[in-house]
Amino acid sequence: MSPGGPPEGEKKRKSIKEISPIDVYKLLPRTNCAECGEANCMAFATRLVNGELLLADCPPLFTPEYQASHEKLDRLLAPPVRTVTIGTGSNAINIGGKYVLQRHDFTYHNPTPIAIDVHDLMPEAELLDRIRQIEGFSYNYIGRTLTLNAICVRSVSGDATTFGNAVRTVIRASHYPLILCTLDPAVMAAGLAEAKEHRPLIYAATESNWKEMADLALAHKAPLAVFAPNDLALLRSLVKTLLSCGIQDLVLDPGTFVEEGLPDTIANFTAIRAAACKQFDELFGFPLLGVPLTVWTGTELSDDVLKWRETLTASVLLSRYADLLIMHSLDGWVLLPQLIWRFNLYTDPRKPVSVEAGVRTFGRPRSEEH
């Protein structure tokens, strides 16, 4: 068992595949009150284990009489990878919440949101135009509308006022959830001052700035990304420290390396997710952030080559457990493969993809006399 697994003598946690409806039923009120909409508590337990219902669908569980049972069910059914919410209200996105390493073992929840970057040195007209492109990008696929999901605001200037102004402009122009990207706590504070009601993702806490970033995350009740490039031991250490500070909503970035570094990236993402889902390592039980955008910071090549590499990197990270992606390109041939692959990856393998049944008219049928 890894250092993040259960202590010696503690009962090993069950995976979602090992939890039976009986395990859940024993902790339910067992009154068959039907407030959940099911005929009895056993039917509710069965659908709960299958991920079709939530504990919140059982009102009696939230009364003082059943508080102990509610807490036990929370622990029993909690996913090994925590769910983290970015944004607020109807515009919020959930990332993580994974139960299994391999999709076919159960199903994947919370399809990977794709964020597109903007930066604080863009002229306002260019910034607003890019926001319109991000929000306007959509594609109809098998009756579903596929879209982008978030905006990442990067500090290129390194200036707090400039960054704050850019964040303000984005908030006024867009309803999308935000990722604020700077390693300078003073610059981040300016961005958070503009986005304090929007619960953005703070990117990122590192070995050198974790204390200041932790204070900002606590003050603004915002999720915090943890960045330790190609150093899983440091990543675990930072997570442990931040948890001890009282921060529960963390997102892990082990670094996105391209070209010769891509195998290391795949290995790191896989190791983290395997530790969480197979060994129940709580320090690695957080959503993973992939940044295909990094292809634009490497070797200077033609735009088409860089876009192709970004496409490749994004597809690989989607396949290897990334719960959130930050990208740069807005070309259809770069984004559509990600949106379509995401849709197919996050379909429930227990339920075939289908379209609404019905009779449809094609053309103009003529009467027999014609």
Feature locations, PLM:
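Local cysteine-cluster metal-coordination motifs and their immediate loop/turn environment
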Residues: 29-47, 56-60
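Active-site beta->alpha loop and helix N-cap motifs at the rims of alpha/beta catalytic domains
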Residues: 77-236
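Active-site glycine- and acidic-residue-rich loops that bind
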Residues: 227-235, 256-271, 305-308
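Conserved small/polar residues in nucleotide/adenosyl-binding loops
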Residues: 369-370
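C-terminal helical cap(s) of enzyme catalytic domains, especially alpha/beta-barrels
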Residues: 265-269, 331-352
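Immediate flanking context of iron-sulfur cluster ligation sites
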Residues: 18-35, 50
